[in-house]
UniProtKB/Swiss-Prot annotation:
PANTHER family the UniProt entry points to: THIAMINE REPRESSIBLE GENES REGULATORY PROTEIN THI1, TRANSCRIPTION FACTOR PDR1
Ranges of biased composition (kind: Basic and acidic residues): 1-13
Membrane topology per record: Multi-pass membrane protein
Compartments, as annotated in UniProt: Nucleus membrane
Protein name listed in UniProt: Uncharacterized transcriptional regulatory protein C417.09c
Annotated transmembrane regions: 328-348, 601-621, 629-649
Keyword tags: DNA-binding, Membrane, Metal-binding, Nucleus, Transcription, Transcription regulation, Transmembrane, Transmembrane helix, Zinc
Region (Disordered): 1-75
Lineage: Eukaryota, Fungi, Dikarya, Ascomycota, Taphrinomycotina
Ranges of Low complexity composition bias in the record: 35-49
Molecular function GO labels: DNA-binding transcription factor activity, RNA polymerase II-specific; RNA polymerase II cis-regulatory region sequence-specific DNA binding; sequence-specific DNA binding; zinc ion binding
DNA-binding interval(s): 117-143
Keyword match Transport: no
Length: 767
């Protein structure tokens, strides 16, 4: 056992006298120089150790420190720890060097709590003595002083953090001006966010069942649809749970037969329907107009109704007109609008009608039928049935050749909303009908959707129905429908829908990039161009223009299908054409990558403009060019603009000839329908202005154009759509970077803005 040390007046806080401490220091010094000092050993051992130490000292080691010489504090403490750990660990416990306080503890009463050892701090008593303290030394406890780590930061780091805090405060003040930046407000906001980010079990969310609510209210022509978020759907789910699976029927408030309906309040008598039936033309004239409509319009990539059933109902109307009452107002409205549509195309059978001197060119054919149909619009809207969709679809198609764009947009909007109200855009809503009825509803919806988007695009309006909400498939072949003579070809109709969706995709791409909603890259353009050309490859040989004759029933519809293909190509390349025109006008330069991409897509666009003119020349030659067709006139109008801009960029005699051909077609239409003369004058005035400019004259006299514009006239080869090879276009690594200037130039996308005199044509219809 270690002998207890006697008290001494000169003992330090460690319990050693000054002489004993000096002796301990001498022993540690000897041990450091290689000596073997053992406390409590015999004198013999001590002498032997001294002799051995003397030998090492004689060998050239450091001289022995003189008594009283002061050792640096850090060295003294380190040596004391080594001695305690080696010789006195049984009494004090082992001392950890990493926890040692490297300075003497103050004896003043106001010493910091940080300098207290763990045991003294635990018992809340004063820590007295050096290290180890007196209490730990007396009780044989391990004396540990916890020293928290200190974060050392230089001035640069502090300055950087202050700048970051200043910037963050500026951002917060801009984004959240109502929030105060004082400490209590920030702490309250953190608590609020922490509470909102709490995690909850997901099982309750997966157990919630939401379903759409669909009910047939009257018959196959009128349905009532509401999605899962509606009040009726919620009531239906509650009723289902209460009834515990038993059958139940929730009737819509407007179909309750026990009370007077809202429709009865609006139209208490059927005098209007009866008077309009009485004012119909004779049966032979009625069917003549209907047959004209079905032959020249209904087969052109649209579907309106089942013509076989419609014709049977018209026969019944003339045989027994008294059987039709106010509830048949939708059918009578459809009949009047169909006759108005037939009036637009009646001159195709008798073209001399438009050349008659007694013909008033300012009269719109079928306007009286249209005015009579408008009398039934309030009743048709209130029914919200399938006939509502068909009636306003026909009304929009009838006015689409005119410049009443806002009215047409409203008509198609009503048709679209009626289709959504009837659930025609949902697969589950159509599943309860028979195969033919479900297919007819599907075809009608796609026709309305494509035309509504076409008019919306031309006016710069957003989508009325988001594409992701539509889950019905494309039309499917049914022999019972497609074998009929007056039902649109299944293949042509499906292809028209697909090219219409591609046109929407192209316009959405440019519109999103203009408003910074998409990071447009050359890869995106490549993808869409490939989709367009993949659609072109789907056309079978019997749908090629050179393989069909003008006597074919579907000739006009197939020509419109090809017009749709070239329209979407024009939409793809027109921004690059405007960009090149601005470059030439301002004498600016572009890098090689941008020039390559621009040249290719200008050729892509310009080639399609020439093809559109060729197709319209064919229609005019075979007397199928319609004066009152939206597609015929506005596709020619769009192609004329492309050729005109191309003429300003690369003037040539060939381009002038092509532009004159397009303007001749426009004049042919406006001479017989003067309401469109304003749109034609825009082209002719721009042509006259361009021909008078000095830049135009100087480029016209140039020997070489900026790039090749040699595109053959019709008839073209079967693979003419592949003549513009774009495969090598996308290999240039600099293309993506060079597009930035083009996409940041908002003026280059002026074609997206509404224009009274320029409506970009659709791709899916006959009107």
């Amino acid at each position: 056992m270690h002998a207890r040390m006697q008290p001494h007046e000169d003992r330090s806080r460690s319990g050693m006298s000054r002489s004993e401490a000096m002796e301990l220091e001498d022993q540690l010094e000897e041990e450091e120089r290689g000596g073997n000092v053992v406390v409590g050993s015999s004198s013999a051992n001590a002498n032997a150790s001294t002799a051995e130490t003397g030998k090492k000292s004689a060998g050239g080691s450091k001289p022995k420190r003189r008594r009283g010489e002061r050792i640096p504090p850090s060295k003294r403490i380190r040596k004391a720890i080594a001695y305690v750990n080696k010789y006195a660990s049984g009494c004090f416990g082992r001392v950890e060097r990493r926890l040692v306080c490297t300075r003497s503890i103050s004896r003043h009463s106001n010493q910091k709590l940080l300098d207290f050892c763990v045991e003294c701090k635990k018992h809340k008593i004063k820590c007295v003595g050096n290290f180890p303290c007196g209490r730990c030394l007396k009780k044989g406890l391990e004396c540990v002083i916890e020293t928290p780590p200190r974060l050392l930061m230089n001035k640069d780091e502090i300055s950087l953090n202050l700048q970051r805090l200043s910037h963050m405060e500026t951002i917060l003040s801009k984004l959240m001006p109502s929030m105060s930046l004082d400490l209590p407000s920030l702490e309250a906001k953190i608590a609020e966010l922490s509470e909102s980010l709490q995690t909850y079990p997901d099982k309750v969310l997966t157990d919630i069942e939401l379903g759409s609510y669909q009910q047939v209210t009257l018959n196959e022509t009128q349905t009532y649809y509401e999605d899962a978020g509606s009040n009726e759907s919620f009531v239906a789910r509650v009723h289902e749970i209460i009834c515990q699976g038993r059958e139940f029927q929730v009737q819509h408030k407007l179909t309750n037969k026990g009370n007077k309906t809202f429709e009865d309040i609006l139209d208490p008598a059927d005098n209007t329907v009866a008077s309009l039936i009485h004012a119909l033309p004779p049966k032979d004239i009625t069917f003549y107009l209907l047959m004209t409509f079905w032959q020249f319009s209904s087969d052109n990539n649209h579907f309106y109704y089942n013509t076989k059933l419609f014709a049977a109902k018209v026969h019944h109307l003339f045989d027994d007109p008294t059987s039709f009452q106010s509830k048949d107002g939708g059918f009578v409205c459809m009949l009047l609008l169909s006759m108005a549509m037939g009036s637009l195309f009646s001159y195709i059978r008798h073209p001399e009608f438009l050349s008659d001197e007694n013909h008033d060119r300012w009269t719109y054919p079928g306007s009286q039928f249209y005015q009579n149909a408008k009398l039934l619009f309030p009743k048709v809207i209130s029914e919200s049935s399938l006939e509502t969709v068909q009636s306003f679809f026909l009304a929009g198609m009838y006015l689409s050749p005119t410049l009443a764009h806002e009215v047409v947009y409203m008509y198609f909007g009503i048709a679209m909303r009626a289709a959504v109200a009837n659930g025609m855009h949902k697969k589950s809503a159509n599943a309860q009908f028979s195969g033919d009825v479900a297919e007819l509803r599907k075809r009608l919806f796609w026709s309305v959707y494509c035309m509504e988007r076409k008019i919306g695009i031309s006016l710069g309006r957003p989508e009325s129905l988001v594409r992701s909400e539509i889950d019905i498939h494309f039309p499917e072949y049914r022999e019972s429908l497609d074998s009929q003579n007056f039902i649109a070809s299944f293949r042509t109709f499906t292809l028209a829908i697909k090219i219409s969706l591609l046109t929407n995709k192209v316009y959405d791409m440019w519109y999103s990039s203009l408003h910074g909603k998409a990071n447009l890259k050359a890869a995106t353009i490549k993808e869409i161009v490939n989709e367009i050309e993949a659609w072109r490859q789907q056309l079978s040989p019997d749908l090629e223009i050179q393989n069909i004759g003008p006597d074919s029933r579907s000739y006009r519809g197939i020509v419109h299908l090809h017009l749709a293909y070239h329209i979407v190509r024009i939409a793809m390349g027109r921004p690059f054409l405007l960009h090149r025109l601005r470059e030439r006008t301002m004498n600016s330069k572009t890098d090689e990558g941008a020039r390559l991409l621009t040249d290719k897509l200008i050729s892509y666009c310009y080639s399609s403009a020439l093809h559109i003119v060729d197709l319209l020349v064919l229609l005019r030659m075979h007397k199928f060019l319609s004066v009152y067709s939206f597609m015929d006139y506005h596709s020619c109008h769009a192609a004329s603009f492309i050729i005109l801009v191309h003429l300003l960029i690369n003037p040539s005699e060939q381009t002038i000839e092509q532009l004159n051909t397009a303007i001749d077609i426009l004049n042919f239409v406006t001479d017989r329908f003067p309401l469109l003369k304003g749109s034609t004058d825009v082209i002719t005035n721009l042509r006259a202005f361009a021909e008078q400019s000095e830049v135009y004259q100087s480029r016209l006299n140039a020997t070489e154009p900026a790039y090749s514009t040699q595109v053959p006239f019709f008839p073209r080869d079967a693979d003419y759509h592949n003549q513009i090879n774009l495969q090598n276009l996308w290999n240039d690594e600099n293309i993506n970077a060079s597009l930035e200037a083009l996409f940041n130039d908002a003026k280059g996308f002026g074609f997206l803005l509404p224009a009274d005199n320029f409506i970009f044509p659709s791709d899916d219809g006959d009107m």
